[in-house]
């Protein structure tokens, strides 16, 4: 019997994994345990040890992190670095201490070097400094790869990481200050539609992004836990041809929410990196049969969830 502990299990990706393992990917030989920040302070080593003692996991999906959008990162790089370093070191140390067979941690495409060639692939993680806007978060996430390789080299551990592109879906953080681009847009569009005001979008709308639906990412995470045996990271991203501009994303949200007012772009606000195009060649070789949800359908489902759960959504 496998016992799979999911840290950060109540957030965007954790909620999606929970939904998928309770429905289409349910298996009798797996027990899944989802914990959130209310259940355990992973910055505290003793609390984390008590969690591992109580759950006794054979496998771990490590999603817990301090996360935020561009403007939140710009203001708090030190906080993002220290908090995430502490969480990651504790979780991996206890995976080793409790003889966990496999730990799959979650990185992000923003950790890659700012000055790079495209598309980005898994070999490029440490080839130069990340973008200035979120260097604290990026370096802390890169150190997971260093820890994984260290545990493999010294102890033969199979701890690995996945690198998703921009994730969105139900149970996201819709906070207008700290949320990522799509959930913040969905919230803004909802308010603009309700109040009859223009929809204000920060930046020019020209940057390009690959977006992955949280349900698709959940299905991939589960397959990685069950089937991927390498320590090297693997990028979990939609195809390069599925990259969209922020303007395209705004159009999809506007259509899904049926917003008919004016859209205004505030070009005095920062755009962040122009693009972070990632290659999913390794993923497609491993799981050639995988089908992604079309972007507009995923946006429609995400908007519907937010509208239906407006009172209780994180915002």
From Swiss-Prot:
Chain positions of site Lowers pKa of active site Tyr: 141
Record: active site: 137 (proton donor/acceptor)
InterPro entries: Epimerase_deHydtase, GDP_fucose/colitose_synth, NAD(P)-bd_dom_sf
E.C. designation(s): 1.1.1.271
UniProt-annotated site: Important for catalytic activity, residues: 108, 110
Top-level taxonomy: Eukaryota, Metazoa, Ecdysozoa, Nematoda, Chromadorea
UniProt: NADP(+) binding residues: 8-14, 141, 164-167, 180
Superkingdom of the source species: Eukaryota
Name of the protein: GDP-L-fucose synthase
